[in-house]
Amino acid sequence: MLYFVKMAVLRGVKMMDIRHLRYFVSIVDNDFNLSRASQNLYVSQPALSMMITEFENRENIQIFKRASGKIIGLTFAGENYYRDAKEVIKRYNDMRTNLYKSKDCKKGTITIGIPPLVLSAVFSSVLPHLILKNPDINFIIKEIGAYALKSELLLDKVDLAVLLYPERISKNIIDSIEIHSSELALFLSPKHVLAKKQQITWADLHQQKMAIFDQTFMIHHHLKEAFERNNCYPDIVLDSSCWDFLLSAVKTNKELLTILPLPMAELYHSKEFLCRKIESPVPWKVTLCRQRKTVYTHLEEYIFDKLLEAFRPTK
């Protein structure tokens, strides 16, 4: 079969270039309707007709059956040529794919925007592994809050962005795939008055002193919406872009609360703070996003696929 395909490639290169082979196959696939084929190929109908005539005259062979001047089917030679042409096109596409996969897709620069907290909680093992496996790729990691990252993605300042669902960007503009799911939880000092409760209600948080992420983080906006929705109005005494500062603040101040993703409690065990789940919690869903494009670079496709693969559940 490989020999047959190679011979077909040689015949195809000599008799028709790959572009003309695609034209020929498209004519057959469109039931010999030149008008429809030309529209699908974005070429003029006269150009298609001329290509057919020139080919048959040059090779002194008829590949199309005709009736009243119209193409109605394939001759025996045409059927063989159609079969060979499809093999050649497939082989050509495979060759191009393998060429770039084996070389260019693993070289270059890729910029990924990841919120600092997500970087620690979700990407701490995935990203170093990916970087070590691809030494010829220059990874630029932008640590920015997810809310600010939305603009970076839309302005083409990052190739990929890790955001939180709901991103509130039209699905016509971005591709978004969930890679991690958890919830937000309350973090507090063991000496806080709420420390004795095993589960916290939103009413418990009303008028409590609280430190939260600043407005560049989507968690900030999700929390503000949750407070409003649950008629809960805590006393926000400070906001910050540093999750470790928020955690340290509650460890050293028994009157202060903060709300962070639940995985932080699993990653950083300490007797200096407690973690309590919240009744009807705010979901914390991490998504891998990219702008919708007609064509992506091989490097963009490669890294996007590798990240999705890393977070795919193992069977």
Curated annotation (Swiss-Prot):
DNA damage as UniProt keyword: no
GO molecular function: DNA-binding transcription factor activity; sequence-specific DNA binding
Keyword Hydrolase attached: no
Residue stretches making up the HTH lysR-type domain: 16-74
DNA-binding region (UniProt annotation): 34-53
Disulfide bonds: none
InterPro entries found in the cross-reference section: HTH-type_LysR_regulators (IPR050950), LysR_subst-bd (IPR005119), Tscrpt_reg_HTH_LysR (IPR000847), WH-like_DNA-bd_sf (IPR036388), WH_DNA-bd_sf (IPR036390)
Keywords linked to the UniProt accession: DNA-binding, Transcription, Transcription regulation
Any one GO CC term of the record: cytosol
CDD domains recorded: PBP2_LTTR_substrate (cd05466)
Origin: domain of life: Bacteria
Family as reported in the entry's similarity comment: Belongs to the LysR transcriptional regulatory family.
UniProt-recorded name of the protein: Uncharacterized HTH-type transcriptional regulator HI_0775
